[in-house]
Amino acid sequence: MFFFDFLFFFFVCFYMCFVCCVTICLPIELTIVSLLVRGNHFLRFYWCGLERCIACRLCDLICPSLALDVRVGWSFGGHRFADWFTLSYRRCIYCGFCMHVCPTDAITHSLFVMCFCCLAMYLLAPKFLLFGCCFMLFDFYLCFV
């Protein structure tokens, strides 16, 4: 039985090789990607206002899709900080490697679409979800935790 199925699918594939091409041409222009669809990556800060990132560039090196770009800046005291931190949301595959490899826990990720993940926040403040303010408040809170 398996052999006949294999043989049938082989002939179907062989037949489709000689049929005219039906590939749809994709548009060249870039599509708009909403940041709230799959979440936001952002740097966290200490309560005193200093950023946690020490610009070790481990996140930049471990990213499989090369979505991060971190450039090192030096302060007057000789401390390193991230002078330039950019994330390409078109390249990011949301694997989370950058969050797990960070030694200072500087990169965090908002929890995708919050209305599905956080039922208590939806029950306590449904009007914030209607206007989209809940995402901004929660992201601002995570930034300083």
Curated annotation (Swiss-Prot):
InterPro entries reported in the protein's UniProt record: 4Fe4S_Fe-S-bd (IPR017896), 4Fe4S_Fe_S_CS (IPR017900), NADH_quinone_OxRdtase_chainI (IPR010226)
Catalytic activity: a ubiquinone + NADH + 5 H(+)(in) = a ubiquinol + NAD(+) + 4 H(+)(out)
GO CC field: membrane; mitochondrion
Binding residues annotated for [4Fe-4S] cluster 2, in chain numbering: 63, 92, 95, 98
Binding site for [4Fe-4S] cluster 1: 53, 56, 59, 102
Entry's localization field: Mitochondrion
Biological processes annotated in GO: aerobic respiration
Keyword DNA damage on entry: no
Keywords: 4Fe-4S, Electron transport, Iron, Iron-sulfur, Metal-binding, Mitochondrion, NAD, Oxidoreductase, Repeat, Respiratory chain, Translocase, Transport, Ubiquinone
Cofactor entry: [4Fe-4S] cluster
EC number of this enzyme: 7.1.1.2
Cofactor: how bound: Binds 2 [4Fe-4S] clusters per subunit.
Pfam families: Fer4_7
Molecular-function GO terms, alphabetical: 4 iron, 4 sulfur cluster binding; metal ion binding; NADH dehydrogenase (ubiquinone) activity
All residue ranges annotated as the 4Fe-4S ferredoxin-type domain in the record: 43-73, 83-112
Family membership: Belongs to the complex I 23 kDa subunit family.
Function field: Core subunit of the mitochondrial membrane respiratory chain NADH dehydrogenase (Complex I) that is believed to belong to the minimal assembly required for catalysis. Complex I functions in the transfer of electrons from NADH to the respiratory chain. The immediate electron acceptor for the enzyme is believed to be ubiquinone. May donate electrons to ubiquinone.
Protein name stated in the entry: NADH-ubiquinone oxidoreductase subunit 8
Record organism: Trypanosoma brucei brucei
UniProt lineage: Eukaryota, Discoba, Euglenozoa, Kinetoplastea, Metakinetoplastina
